[in-house]
From Swiss-Prot:
It comes from Cereibacter sphaeroides (strain ATCC 17025 / ATH 2.4.3). Belongs to the RimM family. An accessory protein needed during the final step in the assembly of 30S ribosomal subunit, possibly for assembly of the head region. Essential for efficient processing of 16S rRNA. May be needed both before and after RbfA during the maturation of 16S rRNA. It has affinity for free ribosomal 30S subunits but not for 70S ribosomes. Signal peptide: none annotated. Residues 94-168 form the PRC barrel domain. It comes from the Bacteria. The lineage of its organism: Bacteria, Pseudomonadati, Pseudomonadota, Alphaproteobacteria, Rhodobacterales. GO terms for cellular component: cytoplasm; ribosome. Keywords: Chaperone, Cytoplasm, Ribosome biogenesis, rRNA processing. This is Ribosome maturation factor RimM. Binds ribosomal protein uS19. It is found in: Cytoplasm. The PRC barrel domain binds ribosomal protein uS19. InterPro entries: PRC_barrel-like_sf, PRC_RimM, RimM, RimM_N, RimM_N_sf, Transl_B-barrel_sf.
Length: 169
């Protein structure tokens, strides 16, 4: 399993005000930490930005990005995802994972049967949910990402062992 050198840490939600500020949606555990992981890059690496947080705004952070001086420039960046170099991010503890490292992992049940692969990781406020697809499934399998349901994550071999609650299989 190969690791990506950059991880998505946020996205630009649009312009904020008329002086080139942006509404920045942070995907970091502590939202304001996004500014300390810079420079941040576009997905293709074609642009980089230094981030200066200005104020909290509803559901996001107000921020200035280097090289963005007008509302029009800020508007043009709406929807752009921002990536940080992995080595700028904090070290993770045992049993902590970046979502990007889970996506694509093979998922097997405790008996060894293939359940599919992690397609996405969702969090709607109550904890992470793994979306597992493939292995002949017509619908995605949604697994709570808890130790009880996912007792083993082995990044070195690209595998998760899951023990889905009865009825979820």
């Amino acid at each position: 399993m190969t690791r990506t050198d950059r991880l998505c840490v946020g996205a630009i939600a649009g312009a904020f005000g008329v002086k080139g500020e942006v509404r920045l949606k942070s995907f970091c555990a502590e939202p304001s930490d996004i500014a300390s992981y810079g420079p941040l890059f576009t997905e293709d690496g074609g642009r980089s930005f230094r981030v200066t947080l200005t104020r909290p705004v509803a559901g996001a952070l107000g921020a200035r990005l280097s090289g963005v001086a007008t509302k029009e420039e800020a508007d043009a960046l709406r929807g752009v995802q921002l990536y940080a170099d992995r080595d700028r991010l904090p070290s993770l503890g045992d049993d902590e994972f970046y979502h990007a490292d889970l996506i694509g992992l093979e998922v097997r049940d405790t008996g060894g049967a293939l359940l599919g692969r992690v397609h996405a990781v969702h969090n709607h406020g109550a904890g992470d949910i793994l979306e597992v697809t493939g292995a002949g499934r017509r619908e995605a399998l949604l697994l709570p990402f808890t130790r009880a349901v996912v007792p083993t994550v082995d990044l070195s071999i690209g595998r998760i062992v899951a023990d889905p609650p009865e009825g979820l299989e």
